[in-house]
From Swiss-Prot:
Signal peptide: none annotated. The keyword Signal does not apply. Cleaves proteins, imported into the mitochondrion, to their mature size. While most mitochondrial precursor proteins are processed to the mature form in one step by mitochondrial processing peptidase (MPP), the sequential cleavage by MIP of an octapeptide after initial processing by MPP is a required step for a subgroup of nuclear-encoded precursor proteins destined for the matrix or the inner membrane. It is found in: Mitochondrion matrix. Residues 1-27 form a transit peptide. It holds the Pfam family Peptidase_M3. This is Mitochondrial intermediate peptidase. InterPro entries: M3A_MIP, MetalloPept_cat_dom_sf, Neurolysin/TOP_dom2, Pept_M3A_M3B, Pept_M3A_M3B_dom. Binds 1 zinc ion. It comes from Kluyveromyces lactis (strain ATCC 8585 / CBS 2359 / DSM 70799 / NBRC 1267 / NRRL Y-1140 / WM37) (Yeast). The active site is at 566.
Amino acid sequence: MLRTVSVGRQYVQRYFGHCLIVNSVRHSSSATVNRLKQPLRRVFDDDSHWRALNHSNYKLNESKGRKFGLRSTSDLETGLFQNSYLKSANGLVEFTQHSFEKAKELVQKIHSIETQDEMKYYIKDLDQLSDVLCRVIDLCEFIRATHPDKKFVQTAQQCHEKMFEIMNILNTDVRLCDLLTQCLRESDVLGLDSEEIRTGKILLEDFEKSGIYMKPEIREKFIQLSQEISVIGQDFINNTEYVRSNYIKISCELMDAHVNKMVCSQMKKDITGEYYKVPTYGYIPHTLLRTCSDEVIRMKIWTEMHSCSDAQIERLTKLISLRVELAKLLGSQNFAQYQLHGKMAKTPENVSGFLESLVHSTRIKAASELKPLAVLKSELTGTQTPHTSEEVLELMKPWDRDYYGSIQALAQRRSSSLDNGESISSSFSLGVVMQGLSDLFEKIYGIKLVPATPKTGETWSPDVRRIDVVDEHDGLIGVMYCDLFEREGKTPNPAHFTVCCSRNMYLNEADTSTIQVGVNSNGQKFQLPVISLVCDFRWVEVNMGDGKHQQMCLLQLNEIETLFHEMGHAMHSMLGRTQLQNVSGTRCATDFVELPSILMEHFARDTRVLSSISSHYKTGKSLDVEVLKNHQLENQFLQNCETFSQIKMSFLDQELHNLDHTTDGSIDVIAIYHRLERRLAVLPDDQSNWCGKFGHLFGYGASYYSYLFDRAIASKIWDHLFEQDPFNRTNGTKFKEGLLQWGGSRDPWYLLSQVLDEPRLAKGDEWGMRYIGDVKTGM
C-alpha cells in the first residue's frame, strides 16, 4: 500500500546552525492596533491564559508524577488525537490489533470479489485497506519521534514493525495485484474517475516495486529486506544527534593562550591538570568556534562536533548495503534507479544533470561571499591575500566560517546606525507569527487558524496547542496539533507529521470512533486531516513594564522561516482534500512534496509580509520597514554557501545510492564523503565523518535533491504569482485550486504547467528539467 513518510526541515548544523548577526530594531512612530487580545496570538504568547484554558491536561500531567491523581485511563475524556484507544501504551497495542483485524476482513472481502459491481469499488477498497494500515504506521512514526513517555515510544516501535511487515506482505499479494490490473484494464466499463485511475496506477507501481511478478522466494526476500531496512533506518535516525565523544582534550597551554579566561573557567580539566575537557555539545563549543583565534583548536572542536561513533557509520553502511541488495533483487542497477521510478526526475542521470547545472554558478557565488572572510583571514594570519575564486576556496575551511564571520558581523554592528540594543525578535513573538500566518492564509486562501481547547488526554503534552483550520465556505476542514515549544528529550529537528489523511467516507463506513469527521458545504461527511507540527522554540523572560515579567517565545528570522516552511506542509495536508487518502495532501511524489513548504519560505522572507505581521510584544507597534529591509540584507549572509551545502548533501545522497555492489567491506561511506567534499571544494570537510549524522539519508534516500529541485520550482512560482503582490487572492486561489487541492491525484508536471502557464511542462521531459534548473536568483 502506498506510504509517504513524514516531511520536515532538518537544519543541518554543519555551517549554518547559528545566526551570527544580531540585528537591532527601530519601530514606526505611528501607533498600531493592539493585538494582544487576539485569541490565536494569546494562546501562544500568554502561557497563564493557556494554562487556565487547558487546566485539565496540566492537572493530568502533574498527576503522573504523584502517587495520587487520576486513577485510571477511564478518567480521561479521550485518547491521543481523540482516538479513544490511545489513552495508554497498552491502548496503542489494542488499536494496532483492532486495525489488523479490520485489515484482515478487508483482504478477505477483496479476495472474494467476483462480479463487475464488486469490481467498481475495488480501488476504493484498496484505499480503505491502505488507510487502516497507514493510520497505525503514521501514528507510530509520530509517537516514536515525539512522545515524552518512553513506554509509549517503545510500544510504537513494536506496533510499527508489525504493521509495516503486514504492509510489505500485502504489497506482494498476487491476487490483489491481479485484481488491480484487471480493474485498470476495464476502467471505462467500470466507470472509474480520473482520481481512481491515478490512484490505481500508483498502487500498481507499489506492487511492481515490491517484486510482485517475481518468484515467491524473491517476494519473501523483499519482505525480509524491507523490514531490515526499516529497523536499521530507524536505529540510524535515533542516533544522528549523538556526537562521537562528549568532550575532547586540548592542552591548557594552548587554550589559555587563545581562549577567554571566562570561557576556560567553565570547563573541567583532566586528572593530570594539563588538558581542558572541551565539551562537544552545548553553547561552549559554539562560543569557541566564534571567538577562538587559534585554527588548530577550532578545527579539533568543529571536527568532533560533526563526528559520530563508529557504530553509527556501521549502521549507515548496513543501510546502504541493504538498499543495494534490495534494488538488485528487483532488477534495478542501484537503489537510486529503483527509487526514482515514478518521481518527477525519473532517473539518476536527470538528477545528476540538475545538480551539476547548479554547481558552477553557485560555487562562484559562494566564493564571492567567502572572499571578504578570506581576505580578513589572510590579514590576521599573515598569509597571502587571495584574489581568485580558487584561492579563496583553498584558504577557507569550515571551522573558519563562524570565527571570521563573527568578526565581520561585529564590525558591521559597530558601524550601524540602527543599533538600539534590542533584538528584532521582539517584534515576532510566536503568537504574533501564528496570527500573521492565519491572516495571510485568510487573504490568499480564504481559511483561518482557530485555537481550540483539547479534551483531557487528547495531547501528549499539555503545552501542545490544538488549532482548527476553518474554511470560509466549508467550515472546519482539518486539525493541527502544534508542539512548538522546547521540552527535555524532544527532537530539535522541526517536522510535519501526517497522523490522519483527508478522504471521503467509505461506503457503509459506520465506525467513526477513531477518526475526526468534518462536514463540507454540501453536507457530505469526510475524514478530517490531522497533522502535528513539531518545533523546538525557546522560552525567554520578557519585561512587560510596570515591574511585570512574562515567559514568551521570541522568534529570529530563521525560526520564522522554519515555522512558515512547516506550515506550508500543513496547508498542503489541509487543502489537498481528495476522495481517496492515498493521494491526499502530502501523499505525492517525493520530489514534489517540498514545493508548498519552500514556497512559504518566500513569504517568510518578504519584507511586505513580515512588516504586516510584526508587532512588538509590549507596545504592539509594527517594525520599521527600513530596519527590516536592512536586516533582510544582513540575513543573506553566506546564503549561496548554504545552497552549496545543500548541493553537496544531495550529491552525497546520490553517490551512496548509486552504488551497485555489496561486497563485504567494499563500501567506505567516509571515503566517499571526503572524496565528494574535496571535489566540490566549498568549505570542504575532509576531517569528520559527518555523513553518519545526515539523517535524511534514510527518510529521503536517493531523493534529497528534492529540496533543491523544489526550491527552483518554488522560485518560479513565487515570481509568477506572488512577487508583485504576496496577498493577492486571485493568484492564491490559482495556486490553491491549480496545485494544492489535488494532493498527489494529478501528475505534478501537469499541475506545474497550469500554475506557471507553461503548457510544455506537462510532458515532464528533459526540456522541463532544464527549464526548472534555469534559476538565476531567488533559490
